[in-house]
Amino acid sequence: MTAKKNYLISFVILLIICGSIKNSFATHISQPVLIDPKTHFTVGDTVVLSGWVEYNAQPAPDVLLNFKLIRSDGSLVANQSYPSNQKGHFEFKFDTKNELPGSYQFTVTSHCLEIHRYACTYKNQTLSIQLSNP
Protein backbone atom coordinates (compact mmCIF):
# COMPACT_ATOMS: atom_id res chain seq x y z
CA MET A 1 0.00 0.00 0.00
CA THR A 2 2.84 2.38 0.83
CA ALA A 3 4.47 1.75 -2.55
CA LYS A 4 1.25 2.70 -4.38
CA LYS A 5 1.01 5.88 -2.31
CA ASN A 6 4.63 6.80 -3.11
CA TYR A 7 4.06 6.17 -6.84
CA LEU A 8 0.92 8.32 -6.80
CA ILE A 9 2.67 11.20 -4.98
CA SER A 10 5.66 10.95 -7.34
CA PHE A 11 3.35 11.00 -10.36
CA VAL A 12 1.52 14.13 -9.10
CA ILE A 13 4.84 15.90 -8.43
CA LEU A 14 6.06 14.96 -11.92
CA LEU A 15 2.90 16.43 -13.47
CA ILE A 16 3.37 19.67 -11.54
CA ILE A 17 7.01 19.93 -12.62
CA CYS A 18 6.16 19.26 -16.29
CA GLY A 19 3.44 21.89 -16.19
CA SER A 20 5.86 24.44 -14.72
CA ILE A 21 8.51 23.74 -17.36
CA LYS A 22 6.02 24.26 -20.19
CA ASN A 23 5.09 27.72 -18.86
CA SER A 24 8.72 28.68 -18.30
CA PHE A 25 9.42 28.51 -22.04
CA ALA A 26 6.60 30.92 -22.94
CA THR A 27 7.82 34.18 -24.44
CA HIS A 28 6.62 37.71 -23.89
CA ILE A 29 6.04 39.27 -27.30
CA SER A 30 5.64 43.01 -27.45
CA GLN A 31 6.62 45.06 -30.46
CA PRO A 32 7.07 48.72 -31.28
CA VAL A 33 4.81 50.16 -33.97
CA LEU A 34 5.75 53.46 -35.63
CA ILE A 35 2.85 55.76 -36.50
CA ASP A 36 3.08 57.45 -39.94
CA PRO A 37 6.86 57.87 -39.75
CA LYS A 38 8.40 60.71 -41.71
CA THR A 39 11.59 59.60 -43.51
CA HIS A 40 12.94 62.84 -45.01
CA PHE A 41 14.35 65.65 -42.90
CA THR A 42 16.48 68.73 -43.48
CA VAL A 43 19.66 69.45 -41.50
CA GLY A 44 18.53 71.60 -38.59
CA ASP A 45 15.15 69.88 -38.21
CA THR A 46 14.21 67.95 -35.13
CA VAL A 47 13.52 64.32 -35.96
CA VAL A 48 10.35 63.24 -34.17
CA LEU A 49 9.25 59.62 -34.47
CA SER A 50 6.30 58.39 -32.48
CA GLY A 51 4.48 55.14 -32.01
CA TRP A 52 3.09 52.68 -29.54
CA VAL A 53 3.99 49.30 -28.07
CA GLU A 54 1.67 46.50 -29.16
CA TYR A 55 1.07 43.50 -26.91
CA ASN A 56 -1.88 41.20 -27.61
CA ALA A 57 -3.26 43.85 -30.03
CA GLN A 58 -3.38 46.43 -27.22
CA PRO A 59 -1.10 49.35 -26.23
CA ALA A 60 1.30 48.30 -23.46
CA PRO A 61 2.45 50.86 -20.86
CA ASP A 62 5.82 50.80 -19.08
CA VAL A 63 7.62 48.67 -21.69
CA LEU A 64 11.33 49.48 -21.91
CA LEU A 65 12.36 50.59 -25.40
CA ASN A 66 15.79 51.19 -26.90
CA PHE A 67 16.20 53.82 -29.62
CA LYS A 68 19.26 53.80 -31.89
CA LEU A 69 20.15 56.14 -34.73
CA ILE A 70 23.13 55.10 -36.87
CA ARG A 71 24.90 56.97 -39.70
CA SER A 72 25.52 55.27 -43.05
CA ASP A 73 29.18 54.77 -42.05
CA GLY A 74 28.02 52.70 -39.05
CA SER A 75 28.79 55.28 -36.37
CA LEU A 76 26.30 55.67 -33.57
CA VAL A 77 24.44 59.00 -33.38
CA ALA A 78 21.97 58.24 -30.58
CA ASN A 79 21.41 55.37 -28.17
CA GLN A 80 18.64 56.03 -25.64
CA SER A 81 16.35 53.84 -23.56
CA TYR A 82 13.13 54.72 -21.81
CA PRO A 83 9.71 53.13 -21.24
CA SER A 84 6.44 53.64 -23.08
CA ASN A 85 4.07 56.01 -21.30
CA GLN A 86 0.91 55.08 -19.38
CA LYS A 87 -1.05 54.85 -22.65
CA GLY A 88 1.59 52.60 -24.24
CA HIS A 89 2.93 55.35 -26.53
CA PHE A 90 6.48 56.58 -27.13
CA GLU A 91 8.22 59.46 -28.87
CA PHE A 92 11.84 59.76 -30.02
CA LYS A 93 13.27 63.24 -30.64
CA PHE A 94 16.65 64.11 -32.10
CA ASP A 95 18.05 67.50 -33.12
CA THR A 96 19.90 67.34 -36.48
CA LYS A 97 21.55 70.78 -36.43
CA ASN A 98 25.06 69.30 -35.97
CA GLU A 99 24.57 66.34 -38.31
CA LEU A 100 25.77 65.77 -41.86
CA PRO A 101 23.39 65.08 -44.75
CA GLY A 102 23.02 61.45 -45.71
CA SER A 103 21.28 58.20 -44.84
CA TYR A 104 20.59 57.17 -41.28
CA GLN A 105 19.07 54.03 -39.82
CA PHE A 106 16.66 54.30 -36.90
CA THR A 107 15.85 51.20 -34.85
CA VAL A 108 13.44 50.95 -31.92
CA THR A 109 13.57 47.70 -29.93
CA SER A 110 11.06 46.46 -27.37
CA HIS A 111 12.69 45.10 -24.22
CA CYS A 112 9.35 44.16 -22.57
CA LEU A 113 8.03 44.82 -19.10
CA GLU A 114 10.49 44.34 -16.26
CA ILE A 115 8.54 41.33 -14.96
CA HIS A 116 8.69 39.64 -18.40
CA ARG A 117 12.31 40.47 -19.23
CA TYR A 118 13.41 36.81 -18.72
CA ALA A 119 11.14 35.69 -21.58
CA CYS A 120 11.36 38.69 -23.91
CA THR A 121 11.70 38.32 -27.68
CA TYR A 122 13.23 41.79 -28.26
CA LYS A 123 11.25 42.69 -31.39
CA ASN A 124 12.23 45.82 -33.28
CA GLN A 125 11.24 48.11 -36.09
CA THR A 126 13.77 49.76 -38.39
CA LEU A 127 13.36 52.85 -40.54
CA SER A 128 15.71 54.48 -43.08
CA ILE A 129 15.92 58.25 -42.72
CA GLN A 130 17.31 60.72 -45.26
CA LEU A 131 18.84 63.98 -44.05
CA SER A 132 19.43 66.63 -46.70
CA ASN A 133 20.89 70.13 -46.87
CA PRO A 134 18.49 73.05 -46.42
Predicted features by range, described:
Residues 48-56:
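Short edge beta-strand/loop segments characteristic of extracellular beta-sandwich folds
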Residues 56, 93-101:
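Short, surface-exposed loop/turn segments at beta-strand-coil junctions that are enriched for proline
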Residues 83-94:
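Glycine-centered loop-to-beta-strand initiation motif
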Residues 100-121:
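Enriched for extracellular/lumenal, surface-exposed ectodomains of secreted and cell-surface proteins
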Residues 114-134:
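Short beta-strand elements
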